[in-house]
Amino acid sequence: MGFNLNNCYSHPGKLLKVHLENVALLSKRITSSDAAELVSLFHDIGKVNPNFQQKLNGSCPKGYDHHAYLSAYAFLMFLIKNPDIFKALVPQGFNSNNFLISLITIVAKHHGDLPDMIPNDGNPILSGYEVSNLYAFLDKEHISFGNVISELLGIEPSMPSSIEEDRIIRLFLKRIVNKPNDYNVALRFYLEIQSIFSALVKADKSDAGDVLSMLDENEQNLNSFSHIYPDILQGYLDNLNSQTLLNVERTKIRLESINSIRKGLEEGKQIFELTAPTGSGKTLMLLSLASEIIKSKGAKRIIYGLPFLSITEQVESEVLKILKGYEYFVQRIDSKSTNTRFDDIQKELDENPSEKLLQELEALEFQEETFGYPFIITTFVRIFETLLGNKNHELMKLPNFSNCVFLLDEIQSLPPRLYGFFIAYLDKFCKLTGSFAIVSTATQPALRLPDDNKEAKEFFLDYEPPFKLLSLSHYENPVFNRYTVEVQKSIIDIEQLGHQVLQEEKIGACYLEYDSRYKRLIQFHHRKYG
């Protein structure tokens, strides 16, 4: 059974051929990957399934009406029978069975999450139940994909010509599984597969949801933001009162870090360490360093990551103050953040529902899901779930992690065992995606791989610790010694301590072990003030 693509639809009112070509173009635009483009051309080819077409028209077909595994089967046939065409279409891809298997898996799983490519239980990657249902359908329908692939690629592909060939292909799909990659390519391989999957998912949802115009608008906003950001930030800094001893020292440190990053950028560095004392103005320093990267390397999205919600709110307040009049470039995205435009549309919909407002609402949701704003303020959790994750909805953000500047403050809040691992991972990611990262801290954590971990050093073979932006001599400056510790040596009871604390006009902290004494001090405070 052959098919005419011009008679098949991917979504209501959208021709399948148009959808496949649109998604392929978008994927190539997102990643510049030939493999992503080819995968996208095949990802929904299984929608030629007559039962799927009936379902799309509102009927209730009685047979197999799925499409993703059918698409993967068609892709597998093409890869096995046309290795030379594949190499011509994807000249830069990994030359391995693992790469081909992973591409087939992406097609089969593009509506779900990116699966474990080497399952711990020894089972194949793909669902045996789904594969069995697919083969039962193929035994009845005898579907041919030759003319469909020819129309999409513009070339005549070879296809299985015997029952035996088809049997071998089916057996391969049923038992599909990867083998471990060599350590020296494993990380690059994983990042490539993750990138292809995320590009397909984003491109597919962009075309299906008709938000292509928003992608163009996001790109224009990013260029506009990058053009104005350095001047606006500099104007804000010039208006600050820098006459106090503390502010003079802050300015000195900031200028030193800027000179250092200029040198690092000239040397081709992409990941930097900003270790500076508490109170030295790291927020403005980080924003200034991002400005230098944009001036040197062109338009970049800024993703400002922080460990705690309370700090994201503080940074948002500071950034909005700097970018007054351009607040629409900035969006804080965490579990407590809000989008004022989103709230306004909801109110308008309640009063006067319209298709236009619904489309704008969907576009705003998509923009937030994909981190489509020029300046994002978010939590480490959101960043790590995307960088290290496999979830479909989280990987929607990953394409916008390319060509950006990560500002990661308070990096010491990570578990110490992850310091070296995460920075090495981030370093590799930045090198492959044209991104830059500045990790900031006041406590000087060791950002190196463990000396006794041979596997880690093989896995991150070319890792070097981040380029240091500041001398540690600034810690010796008394202007940053803002705390005094007074040890109470005499024995006093809780009520005496409570009275003593309340009499202090200025007190930063009172440290007690978290035990019954701490609870009694709290109870004393409640009795005193209700």
Where are these regions (language model features)?
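Conserved pre-motif I regulatory segment
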Residues: 19, 237-275
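Conserved Walker A/P-loop ATP-binding site and its immediately adjacent core
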Residues: 299-323, 331-338, 446-448, 518-519
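Interdomain hinge/linker at the junction between the two RecA-like core domains of SF2 helicases
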Residues: 443-505
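Inter-Walker segment of RecA-like/P-loop motor cores
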Residues: 325-388
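Accessory nucleic-acid engagement/destabilization modules that flank
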Residues: 1-231
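Walker A/P-loop
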Residues: 267-290
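Conserved strand-helix element at the start of the C-terminal RecA-like helicase core
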Residues: 301-312, 504-529
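SF2 helicase catalytic motif II
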Residues: 381-383, 394-432
